[in-house]
Amino acid sequence: RRHTRLQGDWSSDVCSSDLEHCLRVAHAAGGSGVLIVVGQGGDGPEAEIVERCRNEMKKVLPLAASLGQPILVENVWNRMMYDHDKPPEQGPERFIDFVDSFKSPWVGMYYDIGNHWKYGQPKEWIRKFGHRCVKLDIKGFSRKKDAFVDITSADDDVPWGEVREALAEIGFAGWATAEVGGGDVARLTTVRKQMEKALYG
Protein backbone atom coordinates (compact mmCIF):
# COMPACT_ATOMS: atom_id res chain seq x y z
CA ARG A 1 0.00 0.00 0.00
CA ARG A 2 1.17 3.51 -0.65
CA HIS A 3 -0.36 6.84 0.19
CA THR A 4 0.45 10.08 -1.60
CA ARG A 5 2.72 10.77 1.32
CA LEU A 6 5.52 8.71 2.72
CA GLN A 7 4.16 6.01 4.97
CA GLY A 8 4.64 7.09 8.56
CA ASP A 9 5.86 10.54 7.53
CA TRP A 10 3.00 12.85 6.62
CA SER A 11 5.36 15.81 6.28
CA SER A 12 6.86 14.51 3.05
CA ASP A 13 5.07 14.24 -0.30
CA VAL A 14 5.39 11.05 -2.27
CA CYS A 15 6.81 11.46 -5.76
CA SER A 16 6.99 9.23 -8.81
CA SER A 17 10.21 7.62 -7.55
CA ASP A 18 8.33 6.35 -4.48
CA LEU A 19 5.59 4.94 -6.67
CA GLU A 20 8.19 3.34 -8.93
CA HIS A 21 9.77 1.66 -5.91
CA CYS A 22 6.39 0.34 -4.73
CA LEU A 23 5.53 -1.00 -8.18
CA ARG A 24 8.83 -2.85 -8.40
CA VAL A 25 8.47 -4.29 -4.89
CA ALA A 26 4.89 -5.41 -5.59
CA HIS A 27 6.03 -7.11 -8.78
CA ALA A 28 9.00 -8.80 -7.10
CA ALA A 29 6.80 -10.05 -4.26
CA GLY A 30 4.19 -11.47 -6.61
CA GLY A 31 1.65 -8.78 -5.79
CA SER A 32 -1.17 -7.62 -8.01
CA GLY A 33 -1.34 -3.88 -7.53
CA VAL A 34 -0.26 -0.86 -5.50
CA LEU A 35 -2.75 1.05 -3.35
CA ILE A 36 -2.62 4.83 -3.25
CA VAL A 37 -4.57 7.45 -1.30
CA VAL A 38 -4.98 10.80 -3.04
CA GLY A 39 -3.70 13.31 -0.51
CA GLN A 40 -5.23 14.93 2.55
CA GLY A 41 -7.94 17.56 2.40
CA GLY A 42 -5.99 19.79 4.78
CA ASP A 43 -3.07 20.02 2.35
CA GLY A 44 -4.76 22.65 0.19
CA PRO A 45 -7.44 22.98 -2.50
CA GLU A 46 -8.68 19.60 -3.71
CA ALA A 47 -8.09 20.44 -7.37
CA GLU A 48 -4.42 21.21 -6.72
CA ILE A 49 -3.86 18.07 -4.65
CA VAL A 50 -5.55 15.92 -7.28
CA GLU A 51 -3.49 17.44 -10.07
CA ARG A 52 -0.21 16.89 -8.20
CA CYS A 53 -1.10 13.27 -7.61
CA ARG A 54 -2.20 12.79 -11.20
CA ASN A 55 1.05 14.19 -12.54
CA GLU A 56 3.17 11.87 -10.39
CA MET A 57 1.06 8.83 -11.27
CA LYS A 58 1.26 9.53 -15.00
CA LYS A 59 5.04 9.32 -14.85
CA VAL A 60 4.95 5.70 -13.73
CA LEU A 61 2.04 4.35 -15.80
CA PRO A 62 4.35 2.85 -18.45
CA LEU A 63 6.19 0.99 -15.69
CA ALA A 64 2.92 -0.13 -14.09
CA ALA A 65 1.84 -1.56 -17.44
CA SER A 66 5.15 -3.30 -18.09
CA LEU A 67 5.11 -4.92 -14.65
CA GLY A 68 1.41 -5.74 -14.72
CA GLN A 69 0.81 -3.79 -11.52
CA PRO A 70 -2.26 -1.52 -11.50
CA ILE A 71 -2.28 1.60 -9.32
CA LEU A 72 -5.44 1.44 -7.23
CA VAL A 73 -7.08 4.41 -5.51
CA GLU A 74 -8.66 3.77 -2.12
CA ASN A 75 -11.52 5.80 -0.68
CA VAL A 76 -10.59 6.78 2.88
CA TRP A 77 -11.60 9.46 5.36
CA ASN A 78 -9.09 11.98 4.01
CA ARG A 79 -11.56 14.73 3.04
CA MET A 80 -10.83 14.18 -0.63
CA MET A 81 -13.32 13.36 -3.40
CA TYR A 82 -16.24 13.30 -0.98
CA ASP A 83 -17.80 15.74 1.53
CA HIS A 84 -16.72 14.71 5.01
CA ASP A 85 -19.37 16.53 7.02
CA LYS A 86 -22.35 16.09 4.71
CA PRO A 87 -25.18 13.52 4.63
CA PRO A 88 -24.69 9.92 3.50
CA GLU A 89 -26.33 10.03 0.09
CA GLN A 90 -23.14 10.88 -1.78
CA GLY A 91 -21.87 9.33 -4.99
CA PRO A 92 -18.47 8.21 -6.30
CA GLU A 93 -18.33 10.57 -9.26
CA ARG A 94 -15.18 12.41 -8.19
CA PHE A 95 -13.33 9.13 -7.78
CA ILE A 96 -14.55 7.99 -11.19
CA ASP A 97 -13.51 11.26 -12.83
CA PHE A 98 -10.02 10.90 -11.35
CA VAL A 99 -9.59 7.29 -12.48
CA ASP A 100 -10.98 7.99 -15.94
CA SER A 101 -8.73 11.02 -16.42
CA PHE A 102 -5.78 8.66 -16.97
CA LYS A 103 -7.47 6.83 -19.84
CA SER A 104 -5.52 3.76 -18.75
CA PRO A 105 -6.52 0.25 -17.66
CA TRP A 106 -3.66 0.45 -15.14
CA VAL A 107 -5.52 2.85 -12.83
CA GLY A 108 -8.53 1.60 -10.90
CA MET A 109 -10.30 1.56 -7.55
CA TYR A 110 -9.52 -0.32 -4.36
CA TYR A 111 -13.02 0.20 -2.98
CA ASP A 112 -13.30 0.16 0.81
CA ILE A 113 -16.94 -0.71 1.43
CA GLY A 114 -16.96 0.01 5.16
CA ASN A 115 -15.21 3.37 4.87
CA HIS A 116 -17.86 5.06 2.77
CA TRP A 117 -20.99 3.29 3.97
CA LYS A 118 -21.10 6.38 6.17
CA TYR A 119 -21.33 8.56 3.06
CA GLY A 120 -23.09 6.62 0.33
CA GLN A 121 -24.84 3.45 -0.81
CA PRO A 122 -22.36 0.65 -1.59
CA LYS A 123 -24.58 -0.88 -4.26
CA GLU A 124 -24.65 2.37 -6.20
CA TRP A 125 -20.92 2.97 -5.81
CA ILE A 126 -20.13 -0.55 -7.02
CA ARG A 127 -22.44 -0.27 -10.02
CA LYS A 128 -20.99 3.08 -11.00
CA PHE A 129 -17.41 1.91 -10.50
CA GLY A 130 -18.08 -1.09 -12.72
CA HIS A 131 -14.86 -2.36 -14.32
CA ARG A 132 -12.88 0.25 -12.36
CA CYS A 133 -13.48 -1.74 -9.16
CA VAL A 134 -10.39 -3.97 -9.08
CA LYS A 135 -10.10 -4.88 -5.38
CA LEU A 136 -12.14 -4.53 -2.20
CA ASP A 137 -11.45 -3.75 1.42
CA ILE A 138 -13.98 -5.35 3.74
CA LYS A 139 -14.83 -4.06 7.19
CA GLY A 140 -18.00 -3.55 9.17
CA PHE A 141 -19.44 -0.15 10.02
CA SER A 142 -22.39 1.01 12.10
CA ARG A 143 -24.10 4.20 10.98
CA LYS A 144 -26.05 4.15 14.23
CA LYS A 145 -22.88 4.09 16.35
CA ASP A 146 -20.75 5.97 13.81
CA ALA A 147 -18.03 3.41 14.35
CA PHE A 148 -16.26 0.48 12.73
CA VAL A 149 -17.52 -2.86 14.03
CA ASP A 150 -16.98 -6.55 13.33
CA ILE A 151 -17.99 -7.62 9.84
CA THR A 152 -21.62 -8.89 9.77
CA SER A 153 -21.97 -8.47 13.55
CA ALA A 154 -25.26 -7.35 15.07
CA ASP A 155 -24.00 -3.76 15.00
CA ASP A 156 -22.83 -3.89 11.38
CA ASP A 157 -25.51 -2.25 9.24
CA VAL A 158 -23.64 -2.39 5.92
CA PRO A 159 -26.24 -3.82 3.48
CA TRP A 160 -24.18 -6.86 2.49
CA GLY A 161 -27.00 -8.43 0.49
CA GLU A 162 -27.09 -5.38 -1.78
CA VAL A 163 -23.30 -5.45 -1.99
CA ARG A 164 -23.39 -9.05 -3.22
CA GLU A 165 -26.00 -8.23 -5.84
CA ALA A 166 -24.02 -5.27 -7.16
CA LEU A 167 -20.75 -7.22 -7.27
CA ALA A 168 -22.48 -9.95 -9.24
CA GLU A 169 -23.89 -7.38 -11.66
CA ILE A 170 -20.45 -5.98 -12.51
CA GLY A 171 -18.88 -9.44 -12.66
CA PHE A 172 -16.42 -8.70 -9.88
CA ALA A 173 -13.77 -11.43 -9.58
CA GLY A 174 -10.93 -9.63 -7.80
CA TRP A 175 -9.35 -9.86 -4.39
CA ALA A 176 -11.15 -8.83 -1.21
CA THR A 177 -9.11 -7.94 1.88
CA ALA A 178 -10.35 -7.95 5.47
CA GLU A 179 -9.03 -4.63 6.78
CA VAL A 180 -9.47 -5.50 10.44
CA GLY A 181 -7.35 -6.34 13.45
CA GLY A 182 -5.55 -9.66 13.18
CA GLY A 183 -4.64 -12.24 15.77
CA ASP A 184 -4.17 -15.96 16.24
CA VAL A 185 -5.61 -18.79 14.17
CA ALA A 186 -8.94 -18.60 15.99
CA ARG A 187 -9.27 -14.88 15.31
CA LEU A 188 -8.34 -15.27 11.65
CA THR A 189 -10.82 -18.13 11.30
CA THR A 190 -13.53 -15.86 12.70
CA VAL A 191 -12.61 -13.11 10.22
CA ARG A 192 -12.71 -15.60 7.35
CA LYS A 193 -16.19 -16.72 8.36
CA GLN A 194 -17.34 -13.10 8.66
CA MET A 195 -16.05 -12.35 5.17
CA GLU A 196 -17.75 -15.42 3.76
CA LYS A 197 -21.03 -14.34 5.32
CA ALA A 198 -20.63 -10.83 3.92
CA LEU A 199 -19.66 -11.89 0.41
CA TYR A 200 -21.54 -15.18 0.01
CA GLY A 201 -24.50 -14.77 2.35
What are these regions (language model features)?
Residues 26-47, 67-79, 177:
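Active-site groove signature of glycoside hydrolases
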Residues 11-12, 17, 81-89:
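Conserved glycine-rich "GG(E/T)P / GGGxP" loop and the immediately following alpha-helix
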Residues 11-23, 46-56:
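Glycine-rich anion/phosphate-binding loops
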Residues 66, 70, 98-101:
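Active-site region of glycoside hydrolase catalytic domains
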Residues 21-24, 30-31, 58, 83, ...:
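Histidine-acidic metal/acid-base catalytic patches
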Residues 12, 39, 148-150:
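Vicinal oxygen chelate
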Residues 44-57, 64, 82-88:
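Active-site cleft segment of glycoside hydrolase catalytic domains centered on the general acid/base Glu
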